[in-house]
């Protein structure tokens, strides 16, 4: 796995299942992305106790699952702080008619846990800019979206892809406002 490439959804799902952790890959990734976007330090392990509290009643994770979470944290941090403005979401990519329902559910889980991660990190959302407040409101609305099995599934799949892109844009905007700034970008102004 490269520095900016997420692990496969199924690999993370299998690891969480083996560790008997009741968290999906989408929930885990959304939570980590939210904590990072909320201003959590990326230079230490302060995210781990929050993760343990939120997902496992404060109990530590088995080492293999924690390594998977650490890799996911590192990739997500690299993507959010990159100048490329690219964020990939850890969502299932199954085929077939049922895949759209699984994707919609996973996206809802990702968004809900992203918002929770913002709260865990202590983001001062009440002091957010109008753009960030609008992005957060959009995320809250998108978390409630679903797929209607009576409608054209192909059309809904296309709309879902547009929603996913909007989720990414909202997350990047929120991170730009609340995310911890790297010290290398803080160059003093010389007069």
UniProtKB/Swiss-Prot annotation:
GO cellular component assignments: cytosol
PANTHER family, A to Z: UPF0149 PROTEIN YGFB
Assigned protein family: Belongs to the UPF0149 family.
Protein name (record): UPF0149 protein VV2847
Biological source species: Vibrio vulnificus (strain YJ016)
């Amino acid at each position: 796995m490269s520095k900016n490439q997420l692990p496969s959804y199924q690999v993370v799902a299998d690891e969480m299942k083996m560790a008997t952790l009741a968290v999906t890959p989408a929930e885990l990734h959304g939570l980590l992305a939210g904590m990072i976007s909320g201003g959590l330090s990326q230079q230490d392990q302060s995210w781990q106790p929050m993760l343990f509290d939120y997902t496992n009643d404060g109990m530590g994770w088995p080492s293999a699952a924690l390594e998977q979470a650490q890799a996911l944290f590192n990739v997500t941090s690299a993507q959010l702080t990159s100048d490329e403005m690219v964020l990939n979401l850890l969502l299932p990519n199954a085929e077939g008619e049922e895949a759209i329902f699984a994707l919609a559910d996973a996206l809802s889980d990702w968004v809900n846990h992203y918002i929770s991660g913002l709260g865990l990190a202590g983001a001062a959302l009440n002091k957010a800019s109008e753009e960030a407040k609008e992005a957060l409101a959009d995320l809250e609305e998108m978390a409630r979206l679903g797929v209607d099995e009576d409608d054209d599934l192909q059309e809904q799949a296309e709309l879902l892809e547009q929603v996913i892109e909007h989720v990414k844009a909202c997350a990047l905007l929120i991170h730009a406002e609340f995310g911890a700034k790297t010290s290398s970008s803080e160059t003093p102004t010389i007069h």
